[in-house]
Amino acid sequence: MDVQQFDFDLPEHLIAQHPLEDRTSSRLLVLEKQTGNIVHQQFTHLIDHLQAGDVLVMNDSRVLPARLIGEKTDTGAKIEILLLKSLGEDRWETLVKPGKRMKPGTEVVFGNGLLRCVCEDVTETGGRIVRFLYEGIFYEILDQLGSMPLPPYIHAQLEDSERYQTVYAKERGSAAAPTAGLHFTKPYLEQIAAKGVQLAYVTLHVGLGTFRPVSADSVEEHVMHAEYYEIPEETVELVNQAKAEGRRVIAVGTTSCRTLETVGRANGGKLVATSGWTDIFIYPGYTFSILDGLLTNFHLPKSTLVMLVSALAGKENVMRAYKRAVEEEYRFFSFGDAMLIL
């Protein structure tokens, strides 16, 4: 399958640079996957499309302030470090700029000595394995010294870092926000629950690979990045009971979708409480084992996420919906508007 089939023209001014003042004031494009019918609404109308008994599954991962600026202890040269993956015991896989300054044995200091790290190794992809040295609680120090690693297509400064977190973010570990959840406020989630919709949570720590373009010409040749996930027993029970009773399971975001499908596909269409790493790649031709619907943002041309939504709703339906979204000047990407596929 040619990657070019998932390309579309996107004017740069439609890439949202700032979150809206009110999370729920974004727009909502509703796409019926069976008919291809498209409806334009405000996000607050999402509740009208949800039914009592639906299970709405959200990713509760919290974005780390993973960008650190420090200095080499020997020369004072500036170093930028981006945390990618915790390896345990204060060791992290990181990206470093400029990489040539960070050889094994190099020590970097942050925040007047509040935090230090030593480079231990170079990865196959050019990253660095570092070990952090500190006194106190690592994540509290990181909150103090680190900054949010915003996506490469957002050029504006973020005034309030909490606007790049969902209101239910809990489990630290993501390098990027699960952005479909940014549209919700706590009161709106309470309204949805009051309608009889069951709210459930999974954790998938979003990696920077989510922004990596597809470099292969053929969809099937693309290799996905791996991300860590967890599914708790409470979510397993809610989802499995819903599937057994013919009720709908709707994922908030592609990360929730990939978590559900990773485990559901491996267990005959049922969930089990588990954790692990997933590199599942969902594209047209994939048969969904758990998912009935998806709330998501508008994604990059030729991205694996456009391929995922095309697998759920049909490529022609999705590309037509994206064309309409551009014509109607929907806001795209992380701080943009939402799309509901049912």
Curated annotation (Swiss-Prot):
The organism of origin for this protein: Brevibacillus brevis (strain 47 / JCM 6285 / NBRC 100599)
Oligomeric form and interacting partners: Monomer.
Upper taxonomic lineage: Bacteria, Bacillati, Bacillota, Bacilli, Bacillales
NCBIfam families: PRK00147.1, queA
An example Gene Ontology molecular-function term: S-adenosylmethionine:tRNA ribosyltransferase-isomerase activity
Gene Ontology BP annotations: queuosine biosynthetic process; tRNA wobble guanine modification
Family, similarity comment: Belongs to the QueA family.
GO cellular component: cytoplasm
Domain of life: Bacteria
UniProt keyword annotation of Ribosomal protein present: no
InterPro entries: QueA, QueA_dom1, QueA_dom2, QueA_sf
Role description: Transfers and isomerizes the ribose moiety from AdoMet to the 7-aminomethyl group of 7-deazaguanine (preQ1-tRNA) to give epoxyqueuosine (oQ-tRNA).
Keyword match Transmembrane: no
Annotated keywords: Cytoplasm, Queuosine biosynthesis, S-adenosyl-L-methionine, Transferase
Coiled-coil intervals, chain numbering: none
Gene: queA
UniProt-annotated location(s): Cytoplasm
HAMAP family in UniProt: QueA
Enzyme Commission number(s) from the entry: 2.4.99.17
Signal peptide feature range: none
Catalytic activity: 7-aminomethyl-7-carbaguanosine(34) in tRNA + S-adenosyl-L-methionine = epoxyqueuosine(34) in tRNA + adenine + L-methionine + 2 H(+)
Name by which UniProt lists this protein: S-adenosylmethionine:tRNA ribosyltransferase-isomerase
Main localization, broad class: cytoplasm
A UniProt-annotated Pfam family: Queuosine_synth
Pathway: tRNA modification; tRNA-queuosine biosynthesis
